[in-house]
Amino acid sequence: MLENIFHLKENHTDVKTEIMAGITTFMTMAYILAVNPNILSASGMDSEAVLIATALASFVGTALMALLANYPFALAPGMGLNAYFSYTVVLTMGYSWQLALMAVFVEGIIFIVLSLTNVREGIFNAIPMTLKSAVSVGIGLFVAFVGLQNAKLIVNSDSTLVTYQHFKGETFSSVGVGAILALIGVVITAVLLVKKVKGGILYGILITWVLGILCEIAGIYVPNPDAGMYSVIPTAFVSFDFSALGKTFGQVFKTDFSGVGILNFFAVMFSFLFVDLFDTLGTLIGVASKADMLDEDGKLPHIKGALMADSIATCAGAVLGTSTTTTFVESASGVTEGGRTGLTSMTTGILFLLATIFSPLFLTIPSFATAPALIIVGFYMMGSAVKIDFNDPSEGIPAFLTVLAMPTAYSISEGIAIGVISWTLINLVTGKAKEKKISPLMYVLTVLFILKYVFL
């Protein structure tokens, strides 16, 4: 039955590989179950309700990706978009979280329409192959940087923005030990991959977690919640109380629009739409490139199904009570493990569903255990750099700017924007536009990106 649904042989994979890949993707994404409630609760939402909504929205979106597109991509409420939801729309602009959910819901409806009319697919296909390769590399650096941050190997610095962790001081027994365990995890994962151990990334996560548990038992690792370092020893395994979901479920339809200008609402909604659109396209480009899923013209077969899954998941997430649900770049970890079909994403989706019951267990997976997986995935995604013609400055410079912008601006969509603007303008000014037959959509995107920087 699985063969008939997911076409495993056609995609040169098997059930074991797909399931291992799905588990790996989930393990690298599980942090969203802890982080999303923490961020959205700042807007006044109930954190327990958001946790359940996060798990259910992730299940719905990822299962739809498996069934509609047969791709190994997983979805969950997006980082960055959740921060914009709480800290900008609610806390800074002063809108209610119900109104913010309505903006997310409307954005999802618009995306469904755009997906049905091939607009999103057209944008994907209009982006030149050079930029698609650059997006893959940029996402690799972005993911690795996130991994370094999660491991506390890179921390904030007043003088240089960021700096490496200093392995001394009062927080050494928590932050310092966690960072060291993350480094050990990178080495362990690398050795497993060099030895071609199936599931090496997943085993790396589990081994690092076990080392953390042993260190905590021995008193070497000391939890410090003030520093974001929590106990890694599970104190409970299951929870069957889902009543909290009622505090957010359906609240989107109880939005009070009194005192809210229509232009202000659409400005908020457009911001969600813009970031979600290009984060999703960027992730699809990057992960699909890594998995060699793009055809010779740089197009992604069945992309309409993937975009539809993303759109419906956003609407479902808003109804359940969470910010924009989008395709996760951590899907690359499962692809690196050999995931090639929807069985990978279905496995991930089922684990998110189970997380509503086993949330106490999953929430104890420390960030220093999943960080090595993200760092290693970053390495694998660098392979697309060989597809970029750096000997041609009209191709190489926009590609370089795309790669540079993603980790430094901490945004996939900003990297795409910089890449599209620079690629179009450089080729237009140098007279290469006709030679390269630039798609009219690229001109439209360039204008839209410039307007975005001017007015938003």
PLM-predicted stretches and their roles:
Residues 19, 39, 123, 199, ...:
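Residue-level signature of catalytic and energy-coupling elements of molecular machines
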Residues 44-63:
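Loop-to-helix transition at the N-terminal end of transmembrane alpha-helices
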Residues 58-79, 110:
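Juxtamembrane transmembrane-helix boundary signature
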Residues 93-210, 346-456:
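Membrane-embedded alpha-helical modules
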Residues 23-30, 63, 67, 144, ...:
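Hydrophobic/aromatic residues within the transmembrane alpha-helices of Major Facilitator Superfamily
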Residues 1-49, 165-168, 205, 209-303, ...:
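Helix-loop-helix hairpins and the membrane-proximal interhelical loops
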Residues 12, 16, 184, 266-270, ...:
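Alpha-helical membrane-protein architecture signal
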